[in-house]
């Protein structure tokens, strides 16, 4: 089918991508308007998107045409022009109907609930056959009493909202149409539209010439039949020429006159038939030429759109390449420089903290060295005193040597030699039982010590972890 509605350019551009075949006339474009001209064979008629128009006005010509059983009878009527399109129901009509409905509901809030079930069923049945209408967004319940001032304000507000929405819709439609015209002008689609309308005109002209040729053919056939009938009757009279009467003579004269007239009619109708056939052939050739021109222009337009999209892709790739190069040459060095600066700042702060700590460690080492020197001196003094004491008291040789050391010198000596106070610094082991019967190289594991406690705790943890892993695997299985 071929739609004769002047599409907006944006819809035409989108339809072009969905229907790439330029000569395809068996499909309707994606954004076909509610009113289209449909061609089926040699007939041309106007249809609407729904039967609501015919149901609303059954006496209109459109309703009669749709109700007629033989639509081919209207094929001889001249088709409308490309701009003579049926006016489809617009949104403005629906908005006005919605406005009236809302006003009635606000004025009569209890009317909707006081209707009987039979009336509601009748309304439901009639609403199925009625055309689509915008219903009001809100209906007031019957148990709510609205003051007259509030009701008037609501009615005024609803009217203002509907008028504003109607104005916005109209302005949006105008802007879309203007945008489509600009797109058509920029892309050169106006020439394609002109050729499309020319194709429709040539089709109408070809249809008219074919009707004229059929009429000429019928007249030629009638003239030939009349001449044949006159010749047949003349031959019959000539066969009984010897028995003619006065009536036969007058009849023969009229037959000769009619034969002469029919011969002239046959000659004239044959010439008219030939002219009509030549005109039909010429119109058909012109139609094919216009179709080829339209196909060529559509191909040129498609190539132009394709080239524009190609250059757009190239421009996008170039922009992406520029961004990539800029990121590699400018952004990444700047990020690296900033990262290095931050790293240097952090390293400098860390080095400052390390320097402070090293200064503290050096002071501590100096104090430890001084303490160790004093401890060694005290140890030598006490060792000399101990040797003299041993010589004086040989019976006390088994005594502890630390007994001869004063309590004030023990911390200084422990700082130099940790083994002096090692028994006091270590905690008691958890397992105090000694295992016997093992060789000497297993003494760390046989005798009670912290190392044995740590080894036992590690083995117990390993066994518990192995048991837990096995349980988890069993649960998953």
Curated annotation (Swiss-Prot):
Chain ranges passing through the membrane: 311-331, 455-475
Subunit structure: Homooligomer.
Subcellular location: Mitochondrion inner membrane
Side Mitochondrial matrix, residues: 476-477
Record organism: Cryptococcus neoformans var. neoformans serotype D (strain JEC21 / ATCC MYA-565)
Region (Disordered): 45-128
Name listed for the protein in its UniProt record: Sensitive to high expression protein 9 homolog, mitochondrial
Keywords noted in UniProt: Coiled coil, Membrane, Mitochondrion, Mitochondrion inner membrane, Transit peptide, Transmembrane, Transmembrane helix
GO cellular component: mitochondrial inner membrane
Stretches in topological domain Mitochondrial intermembrane: 332-454
Reported function: Required for the maintenance of the structure of the mitochondrial inner membrane. Involved in mitochondrial morphology. Causes growth arrest when highly overexpressed.
Pfam families listed in its UniProt record: She9_MDM33
Coiled coil (residue ranges): 190-233
Main location class: mitochondrion
Stated family: Belongs to the SHE9 family.
Positions with biased composition (Polar residues): 45-54
